[in-house]
Curated annotation (Swiss-Prot):
Protein name: Angiotensin-converting enzyme
List of catalytic residues: E397, H526, E995, H1124
Swiss-Prot/TrEMBL induction comment: Up-regulated after myocardial infarction.
Protein residues bound to Zn(2+) 2: H994, H998, E1022
Positions annotated to bind chloride 2: R797, W1096, R1100
Subcellular location as annotated: Cell membrane; Cytoplasm
UniProt cofactor note: Binds 2 Zn(2+) ions per subunit. Binds 3 chloride ions per subunit.
E.C. number(s) listed in UniProt: 3.4.15.1
Amino acid sequence: MGAASGQRGRWPLSPPLLMLSLLLLLLLPPSPAPALDPGLQPGNFSADEAGAQLFADSYNSSAEVVMFQSTAASWAHDTNITEENARLQEEAALINQEFAEVWGKKAKELYESIWQNFTDQKLRRIIGSVQTLGPANLPLTQRLQYNSLLSNMSRIYSTGKVCFPNKTATCWSLDPELTNILASSRNYAKVLFAWEGWHDAVGIPLRPLYQDFTALSNEAYRQDGFSDTGAYWRSWYESPSFEESLEHLYHQVEPLYLNLHAFVRRALHRRYGDKYINLRGPIPAHLLGDMWAQSWENIYDMVVPFPDKPNLDVTSTMVQKGWNATHMFRVAEEFFTSLGLSPMPPEFWAESMLEKPADGREVVCHASAWDFYNRKDFRIKQCTRVTMDQLSTVHHEMGHVQYYLQYKDLHVSLRRGANPGFHEAIGDVLALSVSTPAHLHKIGLLDRVANDIESDINYLLKMALEKIAFLPFGYLVDQWRWGVFSGRTPPSRYNYDWWYLRTKYQGICPPVARNETHFDAGAKFHIPSVTPYIRYFVSFVLQFQFHQALCKEAGHQGPLHQCDIYQSTKAGAKLQQVLQAGCSRPWQEVLKDLVGSDALDASALMEYFQPVSQWLQEQNQRNGEVLGWPEYQWRPPLPDNYPEGIDLETDEAKANRFVEEYDRTAKVLWNEYAEANWHYNTNITIEGSKILLQKNKEVSNHTLKYGTWAKTFDVSNFQNSTIKRIIKKVQNVDRAVLPPNELEEYNQILLDMETTYSVANVCYTNGTCLSLEPDLTNIMATSRKYEELLWVWKSWRDKVGRAILPFFPKYVDFSNKIAKLNGYSDAGDSWRSSYESDDLEQDLEKLYQELQPLYLNLHAYVRRSLHRHYGSEYINLDGPIPAHLLGNMWAQTWSNIYDLVAPFPSAPSIDATEAMIKQGWTPRRIFKEADNFFTSLGLLPVPPEFWNKSMLEKPTDGREVVCHASAWDFYNGKDFRIKQCTSVNMEELVIAHHEMGHIQYFMQYKDLPVTFREGANPGFHEAIGDVLALSVSTPKHLHSLNLLSSEGSGYEHDINFLMKMALDKIAFIPFSYLIDQWRWRVFDGSITKENYNQEWWSLRLKYQGLCPPVPRSQGDFDPGSKFHVPANVPYIRYFISFIIQFQFHEALCRAAGHTGPLYKCDIYQSKEAGKLLADAMKLGYSKQWPEAMKIITGQPNMSASAIMNYFKPLTEWLVTENRRHGETLGWPEYTWTPNTARAEGSLPESSRVNFLGMYLEPQQARVGQWVLLFLGVALLVATVGLAHRLYNIHNHHSLRRPHRGPQFGSEVELRHS
């Protein structure tokens, strides 16, 4: 809103604009007051009406000279703020005040007692004005102080800057930078920073000055007979009931404002959400598109009722058509001349400042119109921007100039509006026509005019955002100042009362805490510039009264809001009468001549907005909106990371375009990477590793590029949760954050570790070598020879763990650096973030503690069985179990020793392996059956690419491959594969269903953005296949596949089945829990590299109750013998998956209509169960995992109750059995280690056995045994006892080392780029 800073009324007694303009910046040290030219002093006049007329004429000619000089000095200063110009302005101000003093005192001396009786009304008004001295009443020292205060207040405001946090070189001025931010930015934090910065930078230093100004100003006007400055300002309206009239007007428009406020608040709530918008509270003051929330049209795009209708903001069209500031003023001038009014004089175009200078000058940018009082020089000062809003401001300012032109021949004291509101209303009246779609079409800014109710509502809402939104602000500013001047608002309550009024009338609140150190009123130009503000409230009512009358004069038919008086000379003639009167007559008379009434009335305004008023009421009633702000004390929280994150992008449309581009490019690149990775994993070669590293680099470059881009968005207030979630995920650039040389080194370390693991083998002394798959795995599963198992166990770790150890500390350093650069405390923190839970570690510990009693009972029972097989030399019934005796390289699952621990050995077998082999099952047949299970649930069959491209068996062509089972998504929506060195056995049948579960997950979410193509959390992906495997493993289902002769029944059969399942599921729980317990502590530094292995075995002892069968040292690295450690695959996912798969199973069984024990449930062919699974899988990662959990189970939490329910019969049997045998639960003799004197270091050949340290053929060994049998029994027993004792001592002091993740297929390594 442009204030007519140069417009003057009863000069020199109207402080608002001239006095301010006179005095602006930088006060210099006081100097002697310049003397008034004697020729400008008053002469001698008679003390009668005739003498008064001569007095007035003489005053007029002298005043024009003084006023021109003072206005010129102010103009020079405002358009070039320098110390010299400030000094010259000071001198002109003092001359001005001296002139006012001598002429005012003369008027009082001669006419104070008689002027009100003059017959000439104009003369009465002139003399009454001249004898009001204002600041000229003050003694010279106080006058200098008063001028200094005005100058300093103006300096503070005009030179105020807001500097970017921690970047002092980047500072924003109010115009254009801060104004543009408030108008166009939708970044909550950035707008807040601009708002807070401006209010602090300007308001705080103004506060003490304003207090002193108030005291001096009141003292000055009291000497003129007014109670305070506010009373003087109100006197211009010549109405004893002025304040009551204003209150009446406000109540007329209040219902419309309340409906507009509620509607806008709802729209802001859609944009900013509950965090920042309370639908029953005030609106944060910075969100309404304007520094002062006085007009809201800049947020029209957020609140437009019908977005599909033509855009009524023609800013872009103005820019496209090459409009500039001068053209905007020419267009405004042409409107006035089309009404028959005056064109701008040459001086206007020659001397005005229509744009912000580009030469670096400091200027006062606030738009203002200037009268130089020589009847020909009129100017506008405006830092014009090419926008529709500024086009209205241009018409507003030119309305002031037109007023100047029309009353320029009046006495200087009458050259002002009929009242101050008149002057503000004139330009706005024309702007009401200019802003109509019809007029915008006429001047080429709108292609067509839509005549329909929706377009009308759009237009009227846009106008309401400017006009109606302003009314409470226009009303309250001087309510506050009048309270300050009268003393009702003391300095101790300046800010409190300011915000009380802003909340009371506007329904807004400060967005940050404010107190009495602040002075937020001072952040508005008119406060430090001492420009009365109620004129704007009055003008916003008057302009609609004028508009209504002029439209009638122009012959307009139809709704008032569609009226355009352009080219109506009749309307122009009517308006000219108002302008030419100046303030020579009471404003009530002037108003009556134009509109037929002498009262301010809002009925014309209400008529104009009637359609949108009704529409707003209907919308608010439909939405159940609260009118007003009953929760008036509510305040919004500060944004996270404020103010550092203020420069982030918050435009959701831009974010959406980013997401679309990221998704499009990522699909292509991730497909290429997956192909290169597949090629390497299925044919390990140097050339393949080079290609993979190159693709890895390309993925990292892409990740870094788009991750860096994603970090420019502040998603905290995005209403589109999908966009928000994608960007937050993309912001984590993972390893791509490293510098290129370090990234290359890190990738090489990962490749070297995984390759070392994948190609490793162990060899007999005769050169025969064994790979992990299938050779070593088969030995660990089937051999019951202690020494052979020990040799395999130790040899694998010697070969793999020790080779990986040199890479690992550097890998840890890089992993932590990556995590920290991505905003995490360490790599463990980064891994845990995938679960989006602050309580993850506590929740996992709780789950583990719930399952521990069952594990302890299983451990004790298995230990007793192993003791029966291996004897007390190798098994201590009160100690840990040697880690190599449990049928698996890592002792993670124990099902391979089922034959040693079967509760009821005579019961029918529940292992389908023999039947599978007899029936000629192949790996392909295994996967076909798994595919059939999924399709029986109504789920998707695997596509042809799966069968054509998967590697389902270990190649026989000599290729080195990564045998570890894994499922692969190639990100093109049709190519999904499994890589598995499948053997034909029941375990592999279960594994196949696990891997196919991953494939099904891939297929279900294939149409989501690539960022969401993963499990709801990593444990979900692992659980899906295992859920089906729980059905596949049932005797009922195996019988249906003709793999068991019967479904089996009876207690013994059930306990055997549950035991076999427990050896897989329960035995695995502590192992899956401890691996990442170890890694998290490595990452956070609590486990140092010197203690890697010791702490590994401490955890394996603590949780699993296992010990190494041979001493371990710092040179060993047993965690590295587990695939997931060198492969950098987090492992806690498997612990979680083993919990939630039973929750899923229980829920799916319920959906399938199963009745009976949970462990007997088979969901095969249940479409109802399949639908639950599909609905959860289709979500991918698009929602937080509790939502997916709720779809399947009906509740959002992880729980061990389902798994405990599943194994309840076995738990009860184990407890009874262990009590019967007096088993110790746990391992109180935790320092015990097995006697391995004979076996340690043994290195068998393929056909030879170790006998007393010699490598003999089996026949020779047997002969040797008989020869030595009788001679050596006693010695042998003694030797064994001694060796046992010595090695107990030795092993007590040995170090321990870690290993990783299950080799069996329940741990797929997901290939996500």
